[in-house]
UniProtKB/Swiss-Prot annotation:
This is Ribose-5-phosphate isomerase A. The active site is at E105 (proton acceptor). Keywords: Isomerase. Belongs to the ribose 5-phosphate isomerase family. GO terms for molecular function: ribose-5-phosphate isomerase activity. It comes from Methylobacterium radiotolerans (strain ATCC 27329 / DSM 1819 / JCM 2831 / NBRC 15690 / NCIMB 10815 / 0-1). It is an enzyme of class 5 (isomerase). Pathway: Carbohydrate degradation; pentose phosphate pathway; D-ribose 5-phosphate from D-ribulose 5-phosphate (non-oxidative stage): step 1/1. Gene3D superfamilies: 3.30.70.260, 3.40.50.1360. InterPro entries: NagB/RpiA_transferase-like, Ribose-5P_isomerase, Ribose5P_isomerase_typA_subgr, Ribose5P_isomerase_type_A. One of its GO terms (biological process) is pentose-phosphate shunt, non-oxidative branch.
């Protein structure tokens, strides 16, 4: 069973949580895109919801599927956000931001009554950190901020390197908000809360990809005997 099949299985389970009239946060990334695709099918069948996208890519996909959209200013309180994750641990702490949408993803998730993560079960880890931690930064004073982020990482008991994320042409990747991304390749994060606090203390940091105390549940899909087996961390209610 392929990765797309597992993503679709997790997304299908999340779709069961959607009720008519809901205000939904729509995540970013391949697994979130699978959910948006299924949501579009339900909308075409008559489901009435409004979605708030977390990126321009998600906005474009949702619009192409006929999903009614609003901005977060128009719908500042959401019922549910469905989004993917790069890593999730047993305490529902996440690393997100591989798709460079972490700032909007976190804003939307925190404006929601509930956030549910959907992912391939391979994203479930004992300790966060194998996936590079994205840190969104202001372009102004980039070198100074880069050095300060490296110091913050070391001060939080982590080791590794911090690299500016680049596009294929070698130029810095620019987020939808006009910021850059520093990827902290740490291997393991012994204390995510300490690292999050240390990164927040750096003036040039706009947001980091540690989502702590935000997710209510994670729907994880794994291949078993040629079928998708879906399990849940946390509570879906």
């Amino acid at each position: 069973m392929s990765g797309p099949d597992l993503r679709r299985a997790a997304a299908a389970r999340a779709l069961d949580l959607v009720e008519p009239g809901m205000r939904l946060g729509l995540g970013t990334g391949s697994t979130a895109a699978a959910f948006v695709a299924l949501l579009g099918e339900r909308v075409r069948a008559g489901l009435d919801i409004v979605g708030v996208p977390t990126s321009e890519a998600t906005r474009a996909q949702a619009e192409s599927l006929g999903i009614r959209l609003a901005t977060l200013d128009e719908q500042p309180e959401l019922d549910l956000t469905i989004d993917g994750a790069d890593e999730v641990d047993d305490r529902l702490r996440l690393i997100k931001g591989g798709g460079a949408a972490l700032l909007r993803e976190k804003i939307v998730a925190c404006a929601s009554r509930r956030m549910v993560v959907i992912a391939d079960a391979a994203k479930h880890v004992a300790r966060l950190g194998a996936f590079p931690l994205p840190v969104e930064v202001n372009p102004f004073g980039l070198k100074a901020t880069h050095r300060a982020v490296e110091a913050a990482v070391a001060g939080a008991g982590c080791s590794g390197d911090v690299r500016l994320r680049a596009q294929a042409d070698g130029k810095p990747l620019v987020t939808d908000g006009g910021h850059y991304i520093l990827d902290a390749r740490l291997g393991a994060i012994p204390d995510p809360e300490a690292l999050g606090a240390a990164l927040w203390a750096v003036p040039g940091v706009v947001e980091h990809g540690l989502f702590l105390g935000i997710a209510d549940a994670a729907i994880l899909a794994a291949a078993r005997d040629g079928q998708a087996e879906v399990t849940v961390l946390g509570s879906l209610t």
